């Protein structure tokens, strides 16, 4: 593979972060009726009624969310390429980031599958539907550390970039670290069925998903800019040679 081809793939991988954010918000958030999610304080019959009322939308949304969750993988891969370039021969932060990213992708795909199971049979026992819904949200949230280590490792690597043109502005790296640490309140989420720390609350849902999406978007923007710049430079290097070859063939 040529350097130019590799850089094209890197640019595409960086842009997968934007596609993930948009598509996951549409499928899991809008179609899955998770903007915000149903209250954890709902009774089993009320939750079963909610799932039955929105049966097709919830099933479709979560099936599609399980699919588009894979977009986290190429975005993570490109972030690891950038970090490895920064770290050099001992890329411990890169390894932490790529493992955290792989596990995050698993959660982004596996948890919607659980909600799809909950929606699969509208006539199922309401207690089973509620248990599956609980499993999905608790698993989705309290495994936050896999994403925290990814964000923190990326932020630390960004701050360690001593090149003349760092890939990430310092505020982006600090925001990544802040994002990873901001998930800590989720540890208390299972103890609350109402209020800001419930899974549909102001902190646990709106606040933390907000920091997460800003982190993904900001790092994605600068990764795409970096790949575009390197691709442009690679094209400029080869342009004179390609011109000479074209002139030689025309003679």
What is the predicted role of each segment?
Residues 1-251:
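Hydrophobic, aromatic-enriched alpha-helical segments typical of multi-pass transmembrane helices
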């Amino acid at each position: 593979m040529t350097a130019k081809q590799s850089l094209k793939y890197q640019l595409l991988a960086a842009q997968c972060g934007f596609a993930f954010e948009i598509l996951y918000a549409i499928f899991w958030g809008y179609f899955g009726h998770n903007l915000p999610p149903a209250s954890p304080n709902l009774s089993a019959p009320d939750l079963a009624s909610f799932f039955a009322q929105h049966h097709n939308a919830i099933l479709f949304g979560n099936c599609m969310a399980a699919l588009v969750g894979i977009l986290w993988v190429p975005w993570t891969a490109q972030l690891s390429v950038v970090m490895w370039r920064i770290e050099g021969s001992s890329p411990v932060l890169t390894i932490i980031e790529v493992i955290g990213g792989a596990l995050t992708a698993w959660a982004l795909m596996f948890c919607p599958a659980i909600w799809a199971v909950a929606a699969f049979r509208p006539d199922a026992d309401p207690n089973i539907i509620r248990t599956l819904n609980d499993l999905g949200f608790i698993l989705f949230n309290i495994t936050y550390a896999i994403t925290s280590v990814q964000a923190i490792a990326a932020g630390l690597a960004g701050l360690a970039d001593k090149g003349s043109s760092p890939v990430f502005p310092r505020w982006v790296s600090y925001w990544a670290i802040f994002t990873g640490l901001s998930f800590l309140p989720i540890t208390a989420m299972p103890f609350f069925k109402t209020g800001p720390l419930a899974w549909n609350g102001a902190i646990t849902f709106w606040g933390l998903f907000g920091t997460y999406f800003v982190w993904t978007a900001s790092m994605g923007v600068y990764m795409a800019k970096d790949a575009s710049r390197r691709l442009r430079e690679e094209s400029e290097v080869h342009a004179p040679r390609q011109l000479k070859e074209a002139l030689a063939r025309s003679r």
